[in-house]
Amino acid sequence: MVLPNFKENLEKYAQLLVANGINVQPGHTLALSIDVEQRELAHLIVKEAYALGAHEVIVQWTDDVINREKFLHAPMERLDNVPEYKIAEMNYLLENKASRLGVRSSDPGALNGVDADKLSASAKAMGLAMKPMRIATQSNKVSWTVAAAAGLEWAKKVFPNAASDEEAVDLLWDQIFKTCRVYEEDPVKAWEDHAAILKSKADMLNKEQFSALHYTAPGTDLTLGLPKNHVWESAGAINAQGEGFLPNMPTEEVFTAPDFRRADGYVTSTKPLSYNGNIIEGIKVTFKDGQIVDITAEKGDQVMKDLVFENAGARALGECALVPDPSPISQSGITFFNTLFDENASNHLAIGAAYATSVVGGAEMSEEELEAAGLNRSDVHVDFMIGSNQMDIDGIREDGTRVPLFRNGDWAN
């Protein structure tokens, strides 16, 4: 298989990411995080950003092989300390209100077999050191977009029966272009129409201001409280400078934060999770009074336990997102082993930090005020997928009346 018009579509994709995703404006600083394998796309993104008037584009290259070797051989005292130059770079980006574009293409199992203690220690250290950047991002002080590119090892996992490595990569690029509407005659208009549909769902939920959500499905019976004055968000967001951007490309979700003090019941994952270079399957979580009291996984059990019990704030939830099972990504029938795609095929929850914008006025609140409002504070934010065509969700009003939101995995109305 040779993907027709690949270079033309890759150029359209780069333009879409820069102009519509991150929405580069004259004078902007852009930080681009991208794998060395994606050099061609990186060059197109950099050219497009400067063409739109960016003053500086900083490329932060990543490499799965180098990263794995570091975890295999570096001593623990190096892994649980973040070098000063990384903190200095973060501060420079914050001072310049740099937009952040992350293009993900890593092998989902790049760190399989690496000592879980090393992974946990490094993730914890990075979470603490990068806290100012996380806060700026999660409160939309700066624009940020997460997108994807077809990495070889990732493509081989998604399409193991492809006739060749090249075909696997082409098949994955084809899915990325489809779900990001690159093939549409007018991709920008297609995104505007899609965003309007998602916004209508968010508007309905914001008007209702449900007190809680009740999820039921095989292996799931969970009630999540919602904070007062919570805000459901959808495709588009606005940064502190009043500029629009798209946090995720693709996206099919509407989302808010649950009240981290009010979660009771149990939930079972329905798709694999790729986290910290490991593929985790069969996650089961039990909640009582907002806290995770038990978590197990059929594969990657220790990685999940370390995530929840070794990181501050990771025993509670920071996000609940609604995605209908008939979404295009779900209907493709493909498991992508990549949260950006798999979360947009399924209802999902996030362990850890809530986005500040999930309550009215949250972007201007202190960490203490956000916590008092019911928004979980943590150094981690990890989505896991729980939806299926067997899931029902009810919205529960203050007076206890129930409104069907989802039936058999799709919007009830």
Label every PLM stretch briefly.
Residues M1-D264, G395, T401-V403, W411-N413:
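Active-site bordering "gate/hinge" segments
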Residues N112-D115, A155-P160, G236-A237, N278-E281, ...:
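A short secondary-structure junction signal
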Residues R262-D264, I280-G282, D289-I292, R315-E319, ...:
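Active-site lining segments that contact anionic ligands and/or coordinate catalytic metals
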Residues D294-A363:
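Dual-mode signal for accessory low-complexity, basic/Gly-rich regions
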